[in-house]
Amino acid sequence: MPLGLLAQQVWARDPNDVGKRARRKQLPISQKESQQWLHSLDAVCTARDCCPTTRLVSVGDREADVYDVLAAARPAGVALLLRAAWDRCVSGPERYIWATVEAQPVVERLLLHVPRRGPQAARDATLALRFCPVTRCPPRHRQREGLPTVTLWAVQVQEVDPPTDVTPIEGLLLTTVAVDTMAEAIERVEWYACRWGIEVWHRILKSGCRIEERQLASGERLQRGLTLYSVIAWRIFYATMLARAVPEMPCSVLLELDEWQALYCAIHPCPTPPEEPPSLDQAVRWIAQLGGFVGRRRRDQPGAETLWRGFQHFMDLTKMYRIMRPEPSIRPKPS
């Protein structure tokens, strides 16, 4: 469940650095974009102070496959999980990480339903699961620094006998959390699957809130706008996921009293809302309906763009409802 935004970073690339990849390799991480992952890890470590009994796992995509990130100091209770991007050197007879993992026996075969995507039909994919500990060696170009090796656990899922016309599913995860059993390996894969939530949030921010179309005049205004719309995008995402997880809960867990009352009166329409709030699923569908969602079939789910438009109208309705509604002492009783 997306509980909020822990940290956010904004930066602009220098056009003068284009085409200078070899030179960037010699720079310290503090002068590279890779430092963003260290900043994110710092934010997780800071959050640890607020919830000392909770294990926090910082999940990163392939861009986070950086030695400095994996070797960074972390307090107890803070862990890393990322997707490997490069076939790095490791200790052992196989010398490289992919060969080391693929030399391990398959411990389980998992069945994954792959939904339809564009012209590709939906299919059921069989994934082979492997895992093992690995010792990551420091980068070769930094041998003079005397950097230590890093002990990690690798978990790989690889599609078995994929169709010839599709890209096979394959991923190799690296984590600082020990993986000793098949159940723990599956759990690490499930952890990484949660990272898809940040992609959904970005899609809401870009396609729903259309942040890229906000032609703001300066970088400062752009950052302020991004801050505002980031919270709005989170609320849309949170409302959607909460409604799917607990659809029968009253919508008062998400909406204020005036908000759900304004929504109810606008949808039906009527001057007096009921005493009890509607369900969370119904309220989210009503908000999406304000944005043009039809939902002819019950299983249809509103998308980011309709929810964004719906929330805009919903906020206007709530504002007007607060202005125009009668005082509680003179409100008509429901018939």
Regions found by a protein language model. Give the residues of each.
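Single, function-defining residue in the core of a domain
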Residues: 1-335
